[in-house]
């Protein structure tokens, strides 16, 4: 290992949030879960109606369950900027479709982790929901969406 090189520590890469277009800006560790504060890396400041450059209006926080590390639930708090167009008054949010589906409560990585748990490791929905820190109903409904994608991709 004489030629071993190391990169600087990067929590975004370690948690694979960079694959979802997110960057970790802070963390808080609790005994029963971990909370990661994130921001969306890509800018989305152009109006989708008229094409003018929007003005940052405010920020909202979207909470997602992410894949657990060491069976500790990981919750991601994503700061999503809202923009307003000065020309047509249209208001929109930054695009975070790379990280999660609209109105989803699990990140795309959490859905992938849960499907792997069901298909490969034969875990129950209750165990997956517990590991993700969500209710059984949320885990079951999100897995139903992933199951349709999994089965639909086979044909």
Model-derived regions: residue spans:
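A broadly conserved sequence feature marking short terminus-proximal activation segments
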Residues: 1-61
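Short, positively charged, Gly/Tyr-enriched micro-motifs
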Residues: 46, 51-54, 60-155
């Amino acid at each position: 290992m004489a030629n071993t090189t190391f990169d600087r520590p990067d929590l975004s890469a370690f948690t694979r949030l960079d694959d979802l277009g997110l960057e970790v800006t802070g963390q808080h560790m609790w005994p029963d879960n971990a909370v990661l504060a994130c921001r969306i890396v890509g800018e989305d400041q152009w109006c989708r109606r008229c094409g003018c450059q929007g003005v940052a209006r405010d920020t909202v926080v979207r909470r997602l369950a992410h894949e657990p590390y060491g069976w500790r639930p990981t919750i991601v708090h994503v700061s999503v900027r809202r923009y307003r167009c000065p020309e047509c008054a249209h208001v929109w949010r930054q695009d975070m479709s790379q990280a999660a589906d609209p109105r989803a409560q699990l990140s795309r990585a959490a859905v992938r982790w849960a499907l792997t748990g069901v298909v490969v490791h034969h875990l129950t929905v209750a165990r997956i929901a517990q590991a993700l820190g969500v209710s059984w109903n949320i885990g079951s409904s999100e897995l139903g969406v992933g199951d349709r994608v999994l089965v639909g991709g086979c044909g």
